[in-house]
Amino acid sequence: MSDEDFDLDLDDLKRRMDGALASLRTEFASLRTGRASASMLEPVMVDAYGQKTPINQVGTVNVPEPRMVTINVWDKSLVGKVEKAIRESGLGINPQLNGTIIMLPIPELNEERRRELTKVAAQYAEHARVAIRNVRRDGMDQLKKFKADGMSEDDHKIWSDEVQALTDAEIKKVDDALENKQSEIMQV
């Protein structure tokens, strides 16, 4: 086999690692930081029309003030279900009804809750690191197969170094995102 037959798809590895980072950012967006944001409701599903539905598909989510989220529910019959879904979501928000509009005042976080949220953020980041390392392992396993099939030692070392450099860069992005999220959570 020639060296051209041993072509590791670094773009695919990077795409998969970036997917882990995108997933982490989505998880971070769902963490309540004491500031109102529409994204904090993304994980909340409403039992609407016989299936679990995201809140943004049953109403308009707005952030009129820094500590207030409003949901204008389109179907009046779903207002109670949306309210119930928010109460049971574990976000620690107490919905207030005003006709078809549900108001969600966002309380300030106490010190203990802030520390809990930083630990949750650290767990999310660790899951992302593990996912990135799993992609790295897949790439290294592929390189081992190439080496067994006749790839030169030098080429194997070059490719291994590239995979490791890519992994290190992606892990640094995770660490930076975690640091930013933790400082956002701890901000009073």
Curated annotation (Swiss-Prot):
Localization in the cell: Cytoplasm
Organism: Dinoroseobacter shibae (strain DSM 16493 / NCIMB 14021 / DFL 12)
Entry GO MF terms: ribosomal large subunit binding
Protein name: Ribosome-recycling factor
Family: Belongs to the RRF family.
Keywords: Cytoplasm, Protein biosynthesis
GO CC annotation: cytosol
Gene3D superfamilies in UniProt: 3.30.1360.40, Ribosome-recycling factor
Disulphide connectivity of cysteines: none
Entries under Pfam families matching the protein: RRF
Free-text function comment from the UniProt entry: Responsible for the release of ribosomes from messenger RNA at the termination of protein biosynthesis. May increase the efficiency of translation by recycling ribosomes from one round of translation to another.
InterPro entries the record matches: Ribosome_recyc_fac, Ribosome_recyc_fac_dom, RRF_sf
GO biological process: cytoplasmic translational termination
